[in-house]
Swiss-Prot record:
Gene3D superfamilies: Aspartate/ornithine carbamoyltransferase (3.40.50.1370). It comes from the Bacteria. It holds the Pfam family OTCace_N. It comes from Shigella sonnei (strain Ss046). PANTHER family: ORNITHINE CARBAMOYLTRANSFERASE SUBUNIT F-RELATED (PTHR45753:SF4), ORNITHINE CARBAMOYLTRANSFERASE, MITOCHONDRIAL (PTHR45753). GO terms for cellular component: cytoplasm. One of its GO terms (molecular function) is ornithine carbamoyltransferase activity. Belongs to the aspartate/ornithine carbamoyltransferase superfamily. OTCase family. This is Ornithine carbamoyltransferase. Its EC number is 2.1.3.3. Keywords: Amino-acid biosynthesis, Arginine biosynthesis, Cytoplasm, Transferase. The gene is argI.
Amino acid sequence: MSGFYHKHFLKLLDFTPAELNSLLQLAAKLKADKKSGKEEAKLTGKNIALIFEKDSTRTRCSFEVAAYDQGARVTYLGPSGSQIGHKESIKDTARVLGRMYDGIQYRGYGQEIVETLAEYAGVPVWNGLTNEFHPTQLLADLLTMQEHLPGKTFNEMTLVYAGDARNNMGNSMLEAAALTGLDLRLVAPQACWPEAALVTECRALAQQNGGNITLTEDVAKGVEGADFIYTDVWVSMGEAKEKWAERIALLRDYQVNSKMMQLTGNPEVKFLHCLPAFHDDQTTLGKKMAEEFGLHGGMEVTDEVFESAASIVFDQAENRMHTIKAVMVATLSK
């Protein structure tokens, strides 16, 4: 694909609005081709390394299925399956894997790790998730939004993110809004807003592209007229229980529930979540939250909303694979 060959995919702001749009168009085409049985393998003979310092369901499955569909082979290097950062430096690992593989995916910790891999590997490196950014997720989100509002451009869409916006999802949403011209509203307590420097940079770019970025603590004002309401988990399994109580107290008023959906005034509003979601007590963590904090029926989103007709979270999950496939095809095939 012209302009993408041998490029890295580390964060969205590394690309132009036109480049982002072309990736989304390619993803839509690859999805249609797969469903019609007309998919053409562009990556036959390619070898891909998947480095996972953090476990994953959607990201791993998306990369593996996308690679297999396109004729490539993969090697999975899990949290205990390589010497990266332990007995071998990131720099040396990059140079070793770059001699053996045609592309490298990294999912793990600091953004500096994936940047170092990209600097020294000599082959395309893709960011499957870092502490700072989650660009492949946003590609899937944008494709899903296009599919559910086919008559609208991004300039005509309003996306609300409710909850903890200071994480990799909040950062990548800012970058997506900057490039697409979305009306993005981060509805969160001020303590959970992203870093001011990134907000300023992305807001300026968004305005150039016909969009707007708003940060507010006011739920009613923030969600008014929204086309999509998005949230993510509040706590992680590895965090101390003291953090759980603090986070839940801070974010309880930002739970996505039927009241919030109604406050949009839009009967067609859709619900988005990058998953996994704690919408019931059917998981270990969900059960603990219900028992210890009275969060029966959901934490960041209620089970009622998650299971409603407004929920398009499984369309999102499927689109992880199609958009990741687009990234690999664009960067590995001429």
